[in-house]
Amino acid sequence: MKTEAFDTDVLIIGGGNAALCAALMAREAGSRVLLLESAPRAWRGGNSSHTRNLRCMHDAPQDVLVEAYPEEEYWQDLLKVTGGITNEHLARMVIRASSTCRSWMRKHGVHFQPPLSG
């Protein structure tokens, strides 16, 4: 078995959407990043290729986002799916920050499709 040594600041195991975003953020912050993925090339990216919806706050329709999804509606949806068990301060911070995720993902080559209809 061949052994290699890598000098890295951040080690990420797995190459799904969250892992790839974490790797990009760490690299943008100046860290040396090593991402390990065992999936064959055709399967890399985890479930990202099957993801149909992106949940991010937006106050008006924007290209593929056909309706507004304001902070309060997002918060109420979060309360429903968590049964009300959530930290409001932290949740609202994440909800507000989600408004920039689409442009950040686009900057890194993610392509979005319009919603399905029918």
What are these regions (language model features)?
Residues N17-L20, S99:
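Residue-level marker for well-ordered alpha-helical positions
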Residues A22, E37-S38:
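Hydrophobic alpha-helical segments, principally membrane-spanning helices and signal/leader peptides
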Residues A22-A23, R102:
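Generic hydrophobic/aromatic pocket-lining and core-packing "Φ" positions
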Residues R32, S38-G118:
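Conserved N-terminal/central alpha/beta ligand/cofactor-binding core
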Residues K2-A18, L34:
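Beta1/beta-strand and adjacent pyrophosphate-binding region of the FAD-binding site
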Residues A26:
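Aromatic pocket-lining residues of Rossmann-like dinucleotide-binding sites
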